[in-house]
């Protein structure tokens, strides 16, 4: 492979990654993110301060995720589009992933 081919591949990957990020001007809806969290995430994560505990202790509470140094809602949203193997494939849209990430981020203030 030539260097120019490799650079084109890297460039295409970067363009794709940027395209998957939430778009500016389309404000994420944390209240919709809350609904998504209760539907998809509450079985494994504590998704609200009022929730006593999930069915497993393997997944961190959303508030803990939100309070981590360097928390970045855009990175969380991108991760949610292709989660790790232990998480179910929720087939979220970019907007839904951004909403869920906004909701998680809102828990840092609680």
Where are these regions (language model features)?
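Extracytoplasmic electron-transfer domains, predominantly the class I c-type cytochrome c fold
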Residues: 57-106
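Post-cleavage N-terminal segment of exported redox proteins
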Residues: 1-27, 93, 102-110
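Residue-level detector of functional hotspots within protein domains
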Residues: 11-13, 27, 46-48, 71-78
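Alpha-helix initiation/capping motif
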Residues: 26-29, 51, 69, 90
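Generic structural signal for beta-strand residues in well-ordered domains
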Residues: 7-9, 20, 34, 55, ...
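Periplasmic/extracellular electron-transfer cofactor-ligation site
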Residues: 28-58, 83-85, 106-110
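Generic signature of intrinsically disordered, low-complexity, basic-rich segments
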Residues: 13-15, 23-24, 33, 39, ...
């Amino acid at each position: 492979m030539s260097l120019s081919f490799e650079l084109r591949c890297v460039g295409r990957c970067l363009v794709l990654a940027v395209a998957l990020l939430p778009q500016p001007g389309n404000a994420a809806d944390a209240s919709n993110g809350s609904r998504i969290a209760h539907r998809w995430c509450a079985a494994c994560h504590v998704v609200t301060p009022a929730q006593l505990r999930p069915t497993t202790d393997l997944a961190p509470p959303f508030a803990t995720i939100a309070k981590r140094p360097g928390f970045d809602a855009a990175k969380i949203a991108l991760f949610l589009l292709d989660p790790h193997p232990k998480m179910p494939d929720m087939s979220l849209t970019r907007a839904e992933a951004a909403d869920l990430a906004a909701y998680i981020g809102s828990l840092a203030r609680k």
